[in-house]
UniProtKB/Swiss-Prot annotation:
Keyword field: 4Fe-4S, Iron, Iron-sulfur, Membrane, Metal-binding, NAD, NADP, Plastoquinone, Quinone, Repeat, Thylakoid, Translocase
Membrane topology note: Peripheral membrane protein
Lineage of the organism: Bacteria, Bacillati, Cyanobacteriota, Cyanophyceae, Synechococcales
Coiled-coil residues: none
Protein name (Swiss-Prot/TrEMBL): NAD(P)H-quinone oxidoreductase subunit I
E.C. no: 7.1.1.-
Function text: NDH-1 shuttles electrons from an unknown electron donor, via FMN and iron-sulfur (Fe-S) centers, to quinones in the respiratory and/or the photosynthetic chain. The immediate electron acceptor for the enzyme in this species is believed to be plastoquinone. Couples the redox reaction to proton translocation, and thus conserves the redox energy in a proton gradient.
Length: 208
């Protein structure tokens, strides 16, 4: 009789533990069902880079004075500045400028220290290629402006993920009461563009 009661007690404990483990596992599953997905259907959807995103470098040939400051501040001496000295004007004449993005670490030093602001960071990050030599951009390739994510007709800019409230790290934790929920990036831009602080106050209040 004692062994029988022990078996029943053991069976009840095992059944209780099995139910508890099953509940713990399903609770995680059901908790994620009510969250918005964090994945992106790339390349049909793209994340909107942040304002200070360090993407491909844009170069303006007409502004460059061939001072080579970008080469000196670069940790790996990457930019190649090809220039000749004009004996008549006694000034440098720029012939070619190139950056190999297969080696670039996108630190932004060249952009920060450029005296003429001929270098700037863009939001372009799609630099994949089949040949690594194609990553060596000359002054012509560097001068091309990338297509803005919010204005590219071939893709759908991702909603909401780029406009998380302050203190929220995960995209699915954005409050449902937030004013920006369900709006496209250009609509958010239009909302925040007015000079009055009324809209900005509403957004800040919704984040609290």
């Amino acid at each position: 009789m004692k062994n029988f009661l022990q078996q029943i007690n053991s069976y009840i404990k095992e059944a209780f533990n099995a139910g508890k483990y099953l509940y713990n596992g399903l609770s995680v599953t059901f908790d994620h069902l009510r969250r918005r997905p964090v994945t992106v259907q790339y390349p049909y959807e793209k994340l909107i880079p942040s304002e200070r995103y360090r993407g491909r470098i844009h170069y303006e040939f007409d502004k460059c004075i061939a001072c080579e400051v970008c080469v000196r501040v670069c940790p790996i001496n990457l930019p190649v500045v090809d220039w000749v000295m004009n004996k008549e004007t006694k000034k440098k004449e720029l012939r070619n400028y190139s950056i190999d993005f297969g080696v670039c670490i996108f630190c932004g030093n060249c952009v920060e220290y450029c005296p003429t602001n001929c270098l700037s960071m863009t939001e372009e990050y799609e630099l994949a290629t089949f040949d690594r030599h194609n990553l060596n951009f000359d002054n012509v390739a560097l001068g091309r402006l990338p297509t803005n994510v919010t204005t590219d007709p071939s893709i759908k800019p991702l909603r909401e993920l780029a406009y998380l409230p302050k203190g929220v790290m995960d995209p699915h934790e954005i409050p449902a009461s937030d004013i920006r929920v369900g709006k496209l990036p250009e609509e958010v831009y239009d909302w925040m563009r007015p000079t009055s602080n009324e809209n900005k106050d509403k957004i800040s209040n919704s984040n609290n």
